């Protein structure tokens, strides 16, 4: 989200420590910033998972300043799992919405692993 207190030096140190620790199996990436996800994937390699909130089929800004990116783009950029909240629970048909997110993420995975 905009205005967070993280800075690049802090983020790098946290990621480097996590990569080096066998007990860390993954990281949370930013779904609204595919370039940052790709950089995180390049840093952590394929041995760690990346879980990604901040995705929505309706790409854009949320009502509380959060940003949403495309779920397919998130997976193409290196995410292993998308985390979806309001895109499903606020949908008129949550089951259909969940299926749409599954389809979008699966599409990204097939394209990524081509």
Feature roles, as predicted:
Residues 8, 12, 34, 68, ...:
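Electropositive phosphate-/nucleotide-binding environments in soluble metabolic enzymes
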Residues 4-7, 55-66, 89-93, 109-114:
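Short flexible/disordered coil segments
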Residues 1-49, 56-60:
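Conserved anion-binding
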Residues 49, 80-81:
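Residue-level detector of anion-binding/catalytic polar loops
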Residues 38-40, 59-80, 96-101:
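Catalytic cores of alpha/beta
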Residues 75-77, 86-114:
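C-terminal helical cap(s) of enzyme catalytic domains, especially alpha/beta-barrels
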Residues 29-30, 63, 85-87:
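Glycine- and other small-residue-rich loops at beta-strand/loop junctions that grip anionic moieties
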Residues 51-53, 85:
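Generic beta-sheet signal
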């Amino acid at each position: 989200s905009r205005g967070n207190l993280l800075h690049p030096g802090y983020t790098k140190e946290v990621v480097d420590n996590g990569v080096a620790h066998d007990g860390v199996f993954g990281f949370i990436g930013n779904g609204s910033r595919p370039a940052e996800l790709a950089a995180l994937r390049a840093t952590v390699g394929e041995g760690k998972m990346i879980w990604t909130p901040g995705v929505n089929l309706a790409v854009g800004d949320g009502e509380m300043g959060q940003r949403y990116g495309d779920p397919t783009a998130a997976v193409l950029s290196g995410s292993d799992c998308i985390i979806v909240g309001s895109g499903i629970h606020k949908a008129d048909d949550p089951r259909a919405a969940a299926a749409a997110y599954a389809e979008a993420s699966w599409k990204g995975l097939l394209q990524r692993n081509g």
